[in-house]
């Protein structure tokens, strides 16, 4: 099983596309056929070219597999005070080896304070039989 965590460039769409192409090429050349989880801060909402490249590679967006939509409540980035600013830019993609059992974005804070400008997104996975 391969688990890769990434944090793509926050300024350039072209750089993000090249980064995700490099990740996919690395997986294909070194681990093709192995169960694969790719997650992290992709610095782009799901309407962009990075998302399309991941979907076209055959990886599955766990958010979509859970039946969730991208709407005003589905954001992972905020202004440190819990106010959404750019949407769902943190993703978890999986290969067909996995079943997504559960998941969500955690919006909780402690005394109105947040340890990051990203809300955690988690999924519970099981191997397909």
Predicted regions and their residues:
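Active-site-proximal beta-strand elements of phosphoester/diester hydrolases
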Residues: 1-9
